[in-house]
């Protein structure tokens, strides 16, 4: 009987982790930088193609390591230039990655989990339940796949991917270690060299991990707000029952202050017809956010089957935006992109092998975000 050796997947290793790996196989640490450039700058997954690495080391690497990204199931291109990749991860589920071109800017929307346990009522991902956390290699692998697809070299003036947003499937802060590792690779010059201001993590509000985030990484923060009061947010975003608005906004302010720079919080607000789109909601929002440096991104709801919600009229959207503008807020309305390939905000579904029944998901959220578990999870990043 033979046993196969589990190889180290180098794709998800940060620079310190890669250096430690080369230490472990008796090689000099500078080799880490050489290999990382081949992997992330040039999309190479074949050690034999790494021509500035000695043949002896290449043979050693082939025996103990690999470069393995998620499997690309499909790639679709929208009429507006938006691209969507469906990729299969180790759990067997599929997740989605979306690229949105806009002038000289190209934004990649990356998933952090297969499915999501938060069960936000207007999100198609949440309707599927939760299957698994993605590994660091599966998170950064989405950037790697997209970059290879464009044949683009990171950190060059004409690179395709200029911004990354952790706004795909899943709640990034409930996959803390792997998401933080992947974001470090996004910003590392040996990785993708993206500015910290151009890497954004979006959260529905896992308060203890927002506080933990500033200890480990400096990235832009976006809050999925979607309601201006606790009663409504409890219905739309169930985790609000555990971390209500006052607690949540205070944690966001602590995060922004900890960065030590003049930074603003991005507020994401999905507009739902006759639910949260009335002028009184805008007035409540003004009062809620009046002391918080922020910019507001209004997202007209993108319908999906059996959602139970509708997109507001253009007039209703404009009135809501104008009310916020008049109060002095910087407000934009997100243009729907990639709708013809189901790549618009809130439409990402993949093919998730659901491990949670719908009635159990809020319990799962409470367990996932229990303070003791979160503290242990944070400690593991050290």
UniProtKB/Swiss-Prot annotation:
Its main location: cytoplasm. The active site is at 96 (proton acceptor), 345 (s-methylcysteine intermediate). Binds 1 [4Fe-4S] cluster. The cluster is coordinated with 3 cysteines and an exchangeable S-adenosyl-L-methionine. Belongs to the radical SAM superfamily. RlmN family. It is an enzyme of class 2 (transferase). Disulfide bonds join 109-345. PROSITE patterns: RADICAL_SAM. Keywords: 4Fe-4S, Cytoplasm, Disulfide bond, Iron, Iron-sulfur, Metal-binding, Methyltransferase, rRNA processing, S-adenosyl-L-methionine, Transferase, tRNA processing. Specifically methylates position 2 of adenine 2503 in 23S rRNA and position 2 of adenine 37 in tRNAs. m2A2503 modification seems to play a crucial role in the proofreading step occurring at the peptidyl transferase center and thus would serve to optimize ribosomal fidelity. S-adenosyl-L-methionine binds at residues 170-171, 202, 224-226, 302. SUPFAM superfamilies: Radical SAM enzymes. One of its GO terms (molecular function) is rRNA binding. It catalyses: adenosine(2503) in 23S rRNA + 2 reduced [2Fe-2S]-[ferredoxin] + 2 S-adenosyl-L-methionine = 2-methyladenosine(2503) in 23S rRNA + 5'-deoxyadenosine + L-methionine + 2 oxidized [2Fe-2S]-[ferredoxin] + S-adenosyl-L-homocysteine; adenosine(37) in tRNA + 2 reduced [2Fe-2S]-[ferredoxin] + 2 S-adenosyl-L-methionine = 2-methyladenosine(37) in tRNA + 5'-deoxyadenosine + L-methionine + 2 oxidized [2Fe-2S]-[ferredoxin] + S-adenosyl-L-homocysteine. Residues 102-342 form the Radical SAM core domain. Pfam families: Radical_SAM, RlmN_N. GO terms for cellular component: cytoplasm. Its EC number is 2.1.1.192. Reaction proceeds by a ping-pong mechanism involving intermediate methylation of a conserved cysteine residue. This is Dual-specificity RNA methyltransferase RlmN. The keyword Iron applies. NCBIfam families: rRNA_mod_RlmN. The keyword Endoplasmic reticulum does not apply. InterPro entries: Aldolase_TIM, Methyltransferase_A, RlmN_N, RNA_MTrfase_RlmN, rRNA_lsu_MTrfase_RlmN/Cfr, rSAM. It comes from the Bacteria. One of its GO terms (biological process) is rRNA base methylation.
């Amino acid at each position: 009987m033979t046993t196969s050796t589990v190889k180290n997947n180098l794709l998800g290793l940060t620079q310190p982790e890669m250096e430690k790996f080369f230490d472990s196989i008796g090689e000099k640490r500078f080799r880490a930088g050489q290999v990382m450039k081949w992997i992330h700058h040039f999309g190479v997954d074949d050690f034999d193609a790494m021509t500035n690495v000695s043949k002896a080391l290449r043979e050693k690497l082939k025996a103990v390591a690999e470069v393995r990204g998620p499997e690309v199931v499909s790639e679709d291109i929208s009429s507006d230039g938006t691209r969507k990749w469906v990729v299969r991860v180790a759990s067997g589920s599929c997740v989605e990655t979306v690229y949105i071109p806009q002038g000289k800017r190209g934004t990649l929307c990356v998933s952090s989990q297969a499915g999501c346990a938060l069960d936000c009522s207007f999100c198609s991902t949440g309707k599927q339940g939760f299957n698994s956390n993605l590994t660091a290699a599966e998170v950064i692998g989405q950037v790697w796949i997209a970059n290879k697809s464009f044949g683009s070299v990171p950190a060059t003036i004409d690179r395709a991917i200029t911004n990354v947003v952790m706004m795909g499937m899943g709640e990034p802060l409930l996959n803390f270690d792997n998401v933080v590792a992947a974001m470090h690779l996004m910003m590392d010059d040996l990785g993708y060299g993206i500015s910290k201001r151009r890497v954004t993590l979006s959260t529905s509000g896992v308060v203890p991990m927002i506080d933990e985030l500033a200890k480990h990484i400096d990235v832009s923060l976006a809050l999925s707000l979607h309601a201006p009061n606790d009663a409504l947010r409890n219905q739309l975003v169930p985790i609000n029952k555990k971390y209500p608005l006052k607690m949540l906004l205070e944690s966001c302010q602590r995060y922004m202050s900890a960065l030590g720079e003049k930074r603003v919080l991005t507020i994401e607000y999905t507009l739902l017809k006759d639910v949260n789109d009335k002028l009184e909601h805008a007035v409540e929002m003004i009062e809620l956010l009046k002391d918080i440096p922020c910019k507001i991104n209004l997202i007209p709801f993108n319908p999906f089957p059996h959602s139970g919600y509708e997109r507001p009229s253009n007039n209703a959207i404009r009135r809501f935006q104008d009310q916020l503008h008049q109060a002095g807020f910087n407000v934009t309305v997100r243009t729907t992109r990639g709708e013809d390939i189901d790549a618009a905000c809130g439409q990402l579904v993949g093919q998730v092998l659901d491990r949670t029944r719908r009635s159990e998901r809020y319990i799962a959220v409470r367990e996932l975000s229990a303070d003791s578990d979160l503290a242990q999870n944070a400690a593991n990043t050290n």
